[in-house]
């Protein structure tokens, strides 16, 4: 029986490796965590008297039962924090879409490097955001009560860590191990 594909027409099809699939899952998780961090109402909380998010700051005097909220987009460091986090989230979204497209088409290898570069850039942006935020918070806002960085801040760190993991997985040289799968 003759082969339907001649030697000149043979196309190299790269297999989807488990590491790239895990990388795609890492990027998806990073994207979900970033959405949660951006929408979180609690980046800093203080004894049920104060909470700060990326969008608003709310305080409640000890004798009062009502919360007084203000926009946080009035100070430059909070705008910079939000811009860095949203920039990183945009890069993660873009890298997720490129990685998803690479799963659907036959030639995957050419997409590995751009995805890894975008993820490393997102990690740098988000790490800058996550270092800037507590430094400027402690420098500018003086709370005389116990306060802690809450789950919104933790979600942003989780997104950064998953982005870094996905970037590492997309950096692995596929030529060394793709033939084994």
UniProtKB/Swiss-Prot annotation:
Reported function: Regulates cell junction organization in epithelial cells.
InterPro entries named among the record's database cross-references: P53_induced, PMP22/EMP/MP20/Claudin
Family listed: Belongs to the TMEM47 family.
Keywords for this protein: Cell junction, Membrane, Transmembrane, Transmembrane helix
Compartments, record wording: Membrane; Cell junction, Adherens junction
GO cellular component, as recorded: adherens junction; cell-cell junction; membrane
TM stretches of this protein: 21-41, 81-101, 115-135, 152-172
Membrane topology label: Multi-pass membrane protein
Cross-referenced PANTHER family: P53-INDUCED PROTEIN RELATED, TRANSMEMBRANE PROTEIN 47
Organism: Danio rerio
Listed name of the protein: Transmembrane protein 47
Taxonomic superkingdom: Eukaryota
GO biological process: cell-cell adhesion
Gene designation: tmem47
Cited Gene3D superfamilies: 1.20.140.150
């Amino acid at each position: 029986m003759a082969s339907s594909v001649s030697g000149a027409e043979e196309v190299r099809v790269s297999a989807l490796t488990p590491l790239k699939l895990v990388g795609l899952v890492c990027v998806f998780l990073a994207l979900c965590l970033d959405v949660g961090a951006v929408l979180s109402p609690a980046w800093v909380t203080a004894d049920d008297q104060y909470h700060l998010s990326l969008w608003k700051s709310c305080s409640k005097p000890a004798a009062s039962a009502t919360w007084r909220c203000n926009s946080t987009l009035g100070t430059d460091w909070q705008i910079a924090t939000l811009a860095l986090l949203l920039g990183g989230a945009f890069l993660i979204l873009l890298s997720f879409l490129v990685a998803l497209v690479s799963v659907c088409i036959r030639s995957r290898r050419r997409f590995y490097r751009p995805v890894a570069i975008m993820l490393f850039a997102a990690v740098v942006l988000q790490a800058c955001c996550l270092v800037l935020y507590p430094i400027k918070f402690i420098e500018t806002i003086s709370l005389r009560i116990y306060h802690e960085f809450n789950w919104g801040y933790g979600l942003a760190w989780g997104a950064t860590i998953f982005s870094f993991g996905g970037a590492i997985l997309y950096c692995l040289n596929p030529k060394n191990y793709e033939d084994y799968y």
